[in-house]
Amino acid sequence: MLNIEKARTVSAGLPSAIRLKVARTPEELEDVYRLRYQVHVIEDGKFGEQSFPDGRIVDAFDDMSYVANIVAYEGSEAVGTLRINLDSGQGLPPEEHYNFGDFRHGVTESWNRNHDTPARIGSASMLAVQRSWRHRRDVIRAMFKLGAGIGHSWDGSHIIAAVNAKTAGMYERIGFESLDSEQWIEGIGDHVVPMACKFSAFHSWAFGDLIDSLKTLDFFSYRFQRVILAADKVVFRQGDDHGEAYIVDIGAIRISKGGESGEELTLATLGHGQLFGELSLIDTQPRSAQATTLTTTELIALDREDFFSELEAQPHRIRDMLKIFPSVCAAPMNWPLCWRMVPPSSVLSIR
């Protein structure tokens, strides 16, 4: 049963919406680099004598083949960021501060004995959250959840980090373990703790039973965004034309529709693990109902552009993707919509 009243009280004073995504545009990446500088240098006074004349912190690891800079926005303002990397031969950011050689050797030997594919080690680094937002654990958790999905989509086996000693407890709560005592890093001007975790454990913490119940969404991990909303906020209105589908991770959603006499009719109340708005991914028609948060709510979001990009990239998985829409594609009136999803090269494979 949804405990709506208890959760509703938590939302008092929250901003209307916080959106978390992977920074992809030049403008979003600029927001990431400037936020790092604002947090680490201006707010926290770290990085000692290092000079950042342009007010940005950016390094070679931002140009790696496997890099994802996650950014959290309140409106147009970036309030938090986290970087995820996967090693492709040039090392990882935490190895600038600690020798993870023994850990690498041990997990690589163990992994390779028990798996057909080699160990793939990634990292979490450059966590930066505005001081006024550091009490918002839900925002920080949501950044790490996005990171877990990204690492999973890259087939990562393990993740390492050299974390601020003050935040080590937070990392432990999401599955990381300390590899050594805290170390003083002169270049940063602070103590760090080397930590590591299996990506499978990290992913399990982030998604729990969601992927078990919605297995066909697994291959969209890199495309997901997350949206955090206070109670009584509209996700979308009847008649809107924005193409985005959602899964409820935390909280509750009311689906409603305007009646003939002007009253609002409740069609459904949705909770953890339930999918809604999925027809908008394949149909450009306006929304047929309204979705409103009943409590503080965290949603996993997938937009139409990302959905079709993944469809084109993995045409061999079209049959699995169609399983996301069992009720939609079962209705004859929607068959033309579902058929438009199928690339010509996949027609034979789904007959």
Predicted features along the sequence, with ranges:
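Cyclic-nucleotide recognition modules
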Residues: 108-109, 268-326, 330
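Regulatory nucleotide-sensing modules
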Residues: 209-266, 271-276, 287, 350
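Acyl-donor binding region in acyl/amide transferases
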Residues: 90, 94-178, 182, 188-191
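A short helix-loop-beta-strand connector motif used in the catalytic cores of GNAT acetyltransferases and
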Residues: 60-71, 91-93, 243
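A glycine-centered beta-loop-beta connector
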Residues: 73-77, 251, 262, 303
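Conserved beta-strand in the GNAT
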Residues: 69-71, 76-86, 123, 280
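Cyclic nucleotide-binding regulatory module and flanking cytosolic helices
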Residues: 28, 194-234, 281, 313-326, ...
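Short amphipathic alpha-helix that is part of the acyltransferase structural core
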Residues: 7-58, 67-73, 78-79, 213-216, ...
